[in-house]
Amino acid sequence: MRASRFFISTLKEAPSDAEIVSHKLMMRAGMIKRLGSGIYTYMPIGLRVIRKVEAIVREEMNRAHAIELLMPLVQPAELWQETGRWDKMGPELMRVKDRHGREYAIQPTSEEVVTDVVRSEIKSYRQLPLNFYHIQTKFRDERRPRFGLMRGREFTMKDAYSFDRDAEGLKRSYQIMFDAYVKIFNRFGLQFRAVAADNGAIGGSGSHEFHVIADTGEDAIVYCPTSDYAANMEAAEAIAPAVPRAAATQTLTKTATPGKAKCEDVAALLNLPLAQTVKSIVLTVEKEDKGVVSKEIWLLLLRGDHELNEVKAAKIPGLTDYRFANEAEIVEWFGTPPGYLGPINTKKPVKVVVDRTVAAMSDFVCGANEVDFHFTGVNWGRDLPEAMVLDLRNVVEGDPSPDGKGVLAIQRGIEVGHVFQLGTAYSEKMKATYLDENGKPQLIQMGCYGIGVTRIVGAAIEQNFDDRGIIWPAALAPFEVVLCPMGYDRSESVKTETDKLYEALLAAGVDVILDDRGERPGAMFADWELIGAPHRIVIGERGLKEGALEYKGRRDADATAVALDDMLAFVQARLAA
């Protein structure tokens, strides 16, 4: 590739709406161009990176015996209505009508379509197992698109779907795809971690997320440095305290706490550690019976320094469709506004669930259900009955690891892949069956496996950059090598030797670009450091007189002089390293 016949358009400054490093550098390097909110044109340099991501993904999917197809972007509403996701997904699912009034979804994912394909094509157990995948544009109408390709509305993903006879077959397919993902991310040259995760709205049971490690990541990754335990924050278990509950030493006392509605303020007023306080979180569940709507109020108790894990709360039987109670509901059930709530003397009966840590507390502080008052010296069994005890909270650094092999640490990550064991969540709703050896219909066991192709591009930058620009891992760079001739259009010797090296690199299969734009050296070097070419070779008259060229790796502090005749072998060795 010659730069004069390619399109390169760099910026000295990032647009004001670019917030994170990857967004800024992609805009400055001319990789993407904003068309609308969360919608980007992939410019030539950006598209080259995307194609390299796709190529690696495709190779490993094929190696794992997945079969490529391509499902439509626009999908009939009827399929989504079969699974209930037409209504369940809410406004992030883009819905459109054609000229005949028929409704369609602009797909954010393709479980319904692939299940429809399989239920019409798979008849016998002899046709299983099967794995289809595609690499396709998706659209999710994000409430707040931001961070460039990290959270856009239109993006590219690889989706694979496995189909098996039974749960054991699904586990085998799942492991094959899990292993393929590990190979993919290793080939990308990224630091990543696979973590246990919650299935969320997609359904099924059992899943893992793949996160690229980055300080700017939106997700908290929980892991144990001394074992293999890893989970995302939603799925990480906070185990019960190992020590038994201490005996009560204080009497129950109603204590004035004027104007102190937060646990932190109450603890400071009473000169107590925050961990001695208990916070009250009120949830509402609405139930309808024969057109009559009734409300059920739940009170969740957590230690004052802990945070509620909303995913864990939603898994409590009866709380699947909860919402946070409003102030009117709180006053009706507790007799006081938020800030002074507690489990003792509620105005109306509530269902109480206690976090494991709170269940082990004694002599604790909680709201007295009266403005400007809290109870101190509260103890289970004596002052209030023992309640349902569950894991309700987010873990914190230093918590014991659930596997008993150390303590937990937390780092930030960017989710770029997710694998799910769906089971029969979709095949049951869509009646996707096969006939077993006895001619009896059986539900197909499904798995689904996604990789965010365009998100990987942004995540790779978040992990690999400096103050000059992008530092691409070799596998993802738009070009492996850039040739930077000094005076290409003025010096015959520079032009001749540059062209010879260029042709030799091309013949050796190297992805090389020759910068023949005639830019000044400083501007040319700045462009390629910004774009992130891993290997730069400078050809100048002075060096040629000495029989040498200048080589500099993108991560190198200094340039290296290399003999002209040795440069091809030198570059090949660096590429293979």
From Swiss-Prot:
Biological process annotations from GO: prolyl-tRNA aminoacylation
GO MF annotation list: aminoacyl-tRNA deacylase activity; ATP binding; proline-tRNA ligase activity
Keywords noted in UniProt: Aminoacyl-tRNA synthetase, ATP-binding, Cytoplasm, Ligase, Nucleotide-binding, Protein biosynthesis
UniProt-listed CDD domains: ProRS-INS, ProRS_anticodon_short, ProRS_core_prok
Domain of life: Bacteria
Reaction catalyzed: tRNA(Pro) + L-proline + ATP = L-prolyl-tRNA(Pro) + AMP + diphosphate
GO cellular-component term (any): cytosol
Spans traversing the lipid bilayer: none
Function: Catalyzes the attachment of proline to tRNA(Pro) in a two-step reaction: proline is first activated by ATP to form Pro-AMP and then transferred to the acceptor end of tRNA(Pro). As ProRS can inadvertently accommodate and process non-cognate amino acids such as alanine and cysteine, to avoid such errors it has two additional distinct editing activities against alanine. One activity is designated as 'pretransfer' editing and involves the tRNA(Pro)-independent hydrolysis of activated Ala-AMP.
Family: Belongs to the class-II aminoacyl-tRNA synthetase family. ProS type 1 subfamily.
Domain-level remarks: Consists of three domains: the N-terminal catalytic domain, the editing domain and the C-terminal anticodon-binding domain.
The name this protein goes by in its record: Proline--tRNA ligase
Species: Herminiimonas arsenicoxydans
Gene that this sequence comes from: proS
